[in-house]
């Protein structure tokens, strides 16, 4: 597969956004569990 600069840039942004969302939800779950305890 050949990646053009724009495609790799979009892919990088998508991966960055996904990791940020994952970290945000994980942090949210952690605080939720801490509140329940």
Curated annotation (Swiss-Prot):
The lineage of its organism: Viruses, Duplodnaviria, Heunggongvirae, Uroviricota, Caudoviricetes. It comes from the Viruses. Proteins A1 and A2-A3 are necessary for completion of phage DNA transfer. A1 is also required for the shut-off of expression of pre-early genes. This is Probable protein A1. Residues 1-22 form the signal peptide. The keyword Transcription regulation applies. Keywords: Repressor, Signal, Transcription, Transcription regulation. It comes from Escherichia phage Bf23.
């Amino acid at each position: 597969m050949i990646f053009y600069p724009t495609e790799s840039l979009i892919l990088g942004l998508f991966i960055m956004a996904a990791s940020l969302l994952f970290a945000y939800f994980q942090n949210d779950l952690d605080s939720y569990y801490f509140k329940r305890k």
